[in-house]
Design a protein with these regions (language model features):
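Classical protein tyrosine phosphatase
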Residues: 1-3
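Extracellular beta-rich repeat passengers
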Residues: 5-8, 15, 24-113, 117-134, ...
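A phosphate-binding glycine/aspartate-rich beta-alpha loop in the early core of alpha/beta enzymes
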Residues: 19
Length: 296
């Protein structure tokens, strides 16, 4: 089971800090149900329109301001069910969603795949908690260009892959519009700098041509902080791709890079270090996330 909103449809899930809306499962285990899927009419780089990998609904178009509704003070728990033998749901999957949509104060908790994933679109977000999801806490691809503030991501359950996985397009890294989000004030916490288990234990993976302006990040308890791959991504200047003011705490390797052919390269030009508060309280739970979330 899952909830899907087709193009032209809208969802209104509006809780409060004391009474959040909760989408959950009686089983209380990751992958118990599919999660929430929104399909909008905003631009993507896969084609003018495409079929969503989960739900098989159409998404994409040329309406940057498309409105798929409002999700505020909402928890999505234990999502990530298998859709077919190749694809799993995320907690919240945003396919070509426009910036007329409001997504603020949302938690993605204990899913079996990613917490939240953006497939193109222009949607913006604020105050997002993504924790204990078993793959990536945050993920984007297919030309997403949203503006975002205050993300708090935390691995858990002895599983997890990356805090952020960022792509432009896996079949052609040069497709436009390029993924190019603005993201400020973020804390990403891993399972430990010496953790050995499932996943790559990376805070941020930037690859397949993505751009982005990331600012004020705290990366704590990871084997690797920032990893950048593929020639198109590595060809950007700091005006196109930059992690500005990043603080590394208990991170074994701050950064690494690899060309499309697999050769190691230095990527220090893509980030600058500085002490900052990340999502609000450094590694601690931010004040804005208290009272309506779980598992922190």
């Amino acid at each position: 089971s899952y909830i899907a909103v087709a193009q032209g449809g809208q969802i209104f899930s509006n809780g409060t800090s004391s009474k959040p809306v909760v989408f959950t499962s009686e089983k209380g285990t990751p992958g118990s149900w599919g999660g929430i899927v929104l399909c909008g009419k905003a631009p993507i780089n896969k084609a003018k329109s495409a079929t969503a990998e989960v739900s098989e609904l159409t998404y994409g178009g040329d309406v940057a301001t498309d409105n798929s509704g409002t999700i505020t003070y909402t928890r999505i728990e234990y999502a990530g069910a298998i859709f077919n033998n190749k694809k799993e749901f995320n907690g919240l999957s945003l396919f070509g969603v426009g910036n007329g949509t409001k997504i603020e104060y949302v938690q993605l908790y204990a899913g079996s795949d990613d917490g939240i994933e953006f497939f193109g679109g222009t949607v913006n977000t604020k105050y997002i908690v993504s924790n204990e999801n078993e793959d990536d806490q945050f993920d984007w691809t297919e030309g997403w260009v949203g503006t975002n503030e205050y993300w708090y991501g935390k691995e858990g359950r002895n599983k997890g892959n990356r805090g952020i996985e960022a792509d432009n397009n896996d079949s052609n890294n040069n497709l436009t519009p390029f993924s190019n989000p603005i993201i400020k004030n973020v804390t990403l916490i891993g399972l430990g700098k010496d953790y050995v288990g499932e996943g790559e234990n990376q805070a941020i993976k930037l690859r397949q041509g993505t751009k982005g302006q990331l600012e004020n990040f705290v990366l704590a308890n990871w084997a690797k902080g920032i990893d950048i791959e593929h020639d198109v991504t590595l060809g950007w200047t700091s005006k196109d791709l930059l992690v500005k003011n990043v603080q590394f705490i208990n991170v074994n390797t701050e950064s690494s890079g690899k060309t499309s052919a697999g050769a190691a390269v230095d990527v220090t030009k893509f980030y600058s270090k500085a002490n900052n508060t990340g999502a609000g309280n450094g590694v601690d739970t931010p004040t804005w996330a208290k009272g309506w979330t779980v598992g922190l």
